[in-house]
Amino acid sequence: MGVAADLKVVASLVRGMDRDRHSTHAERIQRFYAPQAAAYDQFRERLLHGRQALIAALPCAPGDHIVELGSGTGRNLLFFDDRLAHAARADLVDLCPALLEVAHERHAHRPNVRVFLGDATRYRPVHPVDCVYFSYALSMIPDWQAAISNALRMLKPGGTLGVVDFHLPEGMRQPARAFLRRWFGHDGVRLSDEHPRFLRERLDTVSFSTLRGPIPYLPLIRAPYYLFIGRKRVADPAQ
């Protein structure tokens, strides 16, 4: 692929996600990602930092049922390496058919991987699961609180929720916050400083860190992101 593929992705980013109020969120997502689906992973490898670190830290054991909400192309499952083969089942859930086509092709030979077209705020497996994670998905979900609540409802007591995503860290100056909100918002990414606080209020925190990573073709800007791993409380009537 190379530079030509990058240019296709950059062109989509420059155009941005449309704001057609007569379209659903799922329709806007499909229109935005379909033209760049084939080159999606190559570009995002240099933009979506911390995914491998998050998955390496998830305490998934053989026989576990894993769910990724907002899975896109299913690239993140490969970060599990040998652990994936020993999982009882891994569900990939996304709203975008174009990205899920890539996921289908990538994991067609894995009998324990299932791909679902679905909403992260509503998808629910029949039985409780051991681990749920979001990788750069919460910031794309309008009702991200509902997505987190849904993840908690599908988790077993003591189960693990992991998140890696862009955010606005505490203490960031207002001009920088305004620029990043506008720049990311052009492509449908809703930057917030509320995700970590919401997560810590609802789970027992196992680990939390904030970092910054480079953005392709923008050498002077480093995007802030966070990694969170939490454990569902064993006795919580709200969950």
Question: Across the structure, where does each feature detected by a protein language model lie?
Answer:
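A short SAM/SAH-binding and catalytic strip from SAM-dependent methyltransferases
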Residues: C131-D143
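A short acidic, Gly/Pro-enriched loop at the edge of an enzyme's catalytic core
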Residues: T121-V132
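Class I SAM-dependent methyltransferase SAM/SAH-binding core
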Residues: H65-R122
